[in-house]
């Protein structure tokens, strides 16, 4: 199994999840601008969409889209308990979180990373992100450590990665103390440290 990733991108969530399982896997970085992998392969031949993540399942084909990759990792390694049991309300709540993070929060950051975005456009994006963070802060105010149930799930990995982008886009997480604590809690997990170290994000 091989994960194609871009350092610090949303694929980091899948990288963290793989470390949580303790399974054997490979990683290969992708330059989404040139469309080449670090080994010189044509990434579009692997994933025609051109973005990350992509999980090569060897003879099982290539799986794309972050939420799908995360759920596959969780479901194929049930002992890691990275997702509630299928068919339960807890599972539906986790999927609800994954969908919202992907379609609302993740998307809101887009202009902040897009080349050519004007300063006005970036300011508007920061306002949009702040509104999403307000919603998360409200959820976390009840004292919960994790988004779903009482343990870490793949939804936490995804929220951590996207929320952590605030630190690179001029958004001060101190405005949302519960979210800031959530990000810190996730960053301290061995899986997150291992994945970030492998991607060259930390020493």
Q: Where would I find each of the regions flagged by the language model?
A:
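GST-like domain detector, emphasizing the conserved glutathione-binding G-site
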Residues: 1-124
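Generic structural signal for helix capping and beta-alpha/helix-loop junctions
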Residues: 35-37, 183, 203
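Phosphate-coordinating loops and pocket residues in cytosolic domains that bind phosphorylated ligands
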Residues: 45, 188, 197-198
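Active-site-flanking alpha-helical
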Residues: 74, 162-163, 196
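Short, flexible loop/turn segments with low-complexity composition
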Residues: 85-86, 194-201
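GST-like fold's C-terminal all-alpha helical module
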Residues: 97, 101-191
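Carbohydrate-binding/catalytic loop surfaces
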Residues: 119, 201-203
């Amino acid at each position: 199994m091989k994960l194609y990733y871009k350092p610090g991108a949303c694929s980091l969530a899948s990288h963290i999840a793989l470390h949580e399982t303790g399974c054997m896997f490979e990683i290969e970085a992708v330059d989404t601008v040139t469309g080449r992998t670090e080994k010189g392969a044509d990434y579009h031949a692997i994933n025609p969409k051109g973005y990350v993540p992509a999980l090569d399942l060897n003879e099982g084909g290539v799986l794309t889209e972050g939420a799908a990759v995360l759920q596959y990792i969780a479901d194929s390694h049930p002992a890691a308990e990275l997702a509630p049991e299928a068919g339960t309300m807890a599972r539906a709540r986790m999927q609800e979180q994954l969908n919202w993070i992907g379609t609302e929060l993740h998307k809101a950051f887009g202009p902040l990373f897009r080349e050519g975005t004007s300063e006005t456009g970036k300011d508007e994006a920061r306002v949009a992100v702040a509104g999403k963070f307000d919603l998360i802060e409200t959820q976390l105010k009840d004292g919960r450590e994790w988004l779903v149930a009482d343990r870490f799930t793949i939804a936490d990995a995804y929220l951590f990665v996207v929320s952590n982008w605030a630190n690179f886009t001029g958004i001060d997480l101190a405005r949302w103390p519960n979210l800031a604590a959530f990000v810190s809690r996730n960053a301290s997990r061995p899986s997150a440290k291992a994945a970030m170290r492998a991607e060259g994000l930390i020493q």
